[in-house]
Amino acid sequence: MLAGCKPYEPVPAEFDALVHRAWELWDVGSAEDMEALASAFTTVAPTHPASDGPLRGSMARLTPEQRDVVPLEPRPLADGTVGLPDPVDAAPMLVLNRFECTMAQFEPTVYHLAQDELFEFYDSYDRTYTSSLEDYLSGVNDRITWNADLEATVTLAGVYSETLSGGLRRAQTANGTLLLTRTWIPVPAVWSSENKVFDQDYQINLYMQETDDTIVHLQGVWRHLDLGALGTTESEFVVNAMMSSSIDWDRDTAKLCAEGRP
């Protein structure tokens, strides 16, 4: 293992179960389901307190049935057929972290159209809403959905472009506001260089206010990425870099909150 890498070990089962359940329920979950998710989150998160630092590790892979809760476009497969990618190839990553912000400050960063104005990770980001932002902000609907075309640069690997589908759901529960974001890539990303693959990416994020000025963030990712000589999402080096990137994202979000942006 390279210096500075942490072991990529399974997280406690209750975190694994919560992330998978949230992924499955984003679309179809009832108000009662959201209450159960929020209750589980507020019960599980304190078992890994802030004093222990971020929790990071592996979890169960998605099943074909869990993959199918989001629409993907068929594509050529390695066996010469056309179909959907096998989710067993998408490596699982889970991160629990906390950052300083209030929910009222944080939520606008999620539905902000020009994400590249907020986060330097993107070279470009063009989002189009596929449901009404006005209805979401007024409370008529509890969710908003979007598609985005984006470009980003991976150091030493090159530039990739992708289409990202996603959405934000807000649930008012007895334990407070629960925000759920879910994103995925319906088609493989396109690279500027050869011998790179990024064809599966499924993400679910849960956010709740833990203290007056702290948000607790639980992220689950299932991703298939092959960077050639740099490694794949089956290597600890690549996976650790990605989990560190999630923690950096929270740090940058806290900075936005401190600056009163967006």
Predicted feature residues:
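C-terminal motif of bacterial Sec signal peptides marking the signal peptidase cleavage site
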Residues: 2-4
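Eukaryotic helix-grip
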Residues: 8-262
